[in-house]
Amino acid sequence: MTIMNGFELHYLSFVYAQEFSSKNNNLGGQMKHIIALASKIAFTLALLYVILDRVYHASFLSVMFIALFLGFVSYLSGDMLVLPRTNNITASLADFGLSFVILWVFVLTQTRNDFSPFGAALLSAACLTVFEYFFHRYLLKNVLDENFRNELSARDNTLQYQTEAADELFPETKEKHKE
């Protein structure tokens, strides 16, 4: 029986981890999305708790429900549909609009109206948009696969300018000049 030193043990664990990840490559991609979604919901809950519960006195259960709903909807629509087809700024603005509308309806229906629901929704959506900008950067760097990142960078860096050349609609002919 031989005793392994730290380097050999680290190397063997690295080799086994590589074999496991190559066999379960799809599982690793799914796990990245689950971790990203869970962190998004957790941060959304923390942010909405501070703004809506502490400042505007909404119930914690309502804030937790809206954080779950908003997290799922914005992850599926903004992060998985809009972000891959556009850029970070456009996806963040789309998330702002979506979260503003959802939060405005929530604040109108679930809280006491001794404050401006528009202001509460606007403040919450603006804070969430700042978080979304950095979250999108994280998604592009760590969660979305490398092929997608290469396609995105190639698409953004190769501008294709096109011009159109055509003849005139009614060209002047020599016969018309003689008249």
Swiss-Prot record:
Q: Name one GO cellular component term.
A: plasma membrane
Segments spanning the bilayer are: 33-53, 63-83, 89-109, 115-135
Q: Where in the cell is it found?
A: Cell membrane
Protein keywords: Cell membrane, Membrane, Transmembrane, Transmembrane helix
Under the heading InterPro entries, the entry gives: DUF2512 (IPR019649)
Report how it sits in the membrane. Multi-pass membrane protein
Look up the domain of life of the source.
Bacteria
Q: What is this protein called?
A: Uncharacterized membrane protein YndM
Q: Give the gene symbol.
A: yndM
